[in-house]
């Protein structure tokens, strides 16, 4: 597509401007760089890979461990007129085969997959036929043995890079400097490109209350708050 990143953002998402650091991440990806983005939850990580993927030919492979999020994002993209697919653990072999066939030979922009899928022979067979624009790694801290949520299946992404000549966009909301270095090494970054924002959330306030009856205090707070919340 012959649109700028900002024009693409406006066309498909309706936003007039990027959030802090989003445009830096998008531009780095468009320059064919491997990039690790550390953004807080709610920081707009999806836009950071969806915009550049819409500006490049081919299909972006999005690796995510969260099936519910996978389905929500595919539905959201389809609602915007962007063709997207997903392969998850709840699908039978025939449905998986059909989905991967469509990803390889159809006109789709995004394929969401779980990390467990990457090592299967069927996936590896079809991925060789795909014109892959980007490899997107969501929850990228899961690839690091130094991270709090290490998942061995994420190590398959390194093998995927042997089959696909495409830059990596890795995203996480949490990574220490040690974990960030480990992520970039395990994903085979050609150059270190780390972009991160601060984690201050101006829409949140913090209150510390000293009390003896913690349960009673909690019940009082819950009874005074209307709507939903997290305890």
Spans of model-derived segments:
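Conserved helix/coil segment N-terminal to the catalytic DExD/H
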Residues: 43, 50, 91-134, 143-148
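Pre-Walker A (Motif I) flank of P-loop NTPase domains
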Residues: 31-37, 58-59, 107-109, 166, ...
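Walker A/P-loop
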Residues: 32-51, 61-64
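Conserved helix-turn-beta segment of the N-terminal RecA-like "Helicase ATP-binding" lobe
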Residues: 71-105, 182, 186-187
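Conserved interdomain hinge at the start of the Helicase C-terminal
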Residues: 205-231
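Conserved strand-helix element at the start of the C-terminal RecA-like helicase core
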Residues: 60-70, 224-231
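Conserved pre-motif I regulatory segment
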Residues: 1-40
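Post-DEXD/H (motif II) to motif III coupling segment of the RecA-like Helicase ATP-binding lobe
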Residues: 128-137, 141-197, 215, 219
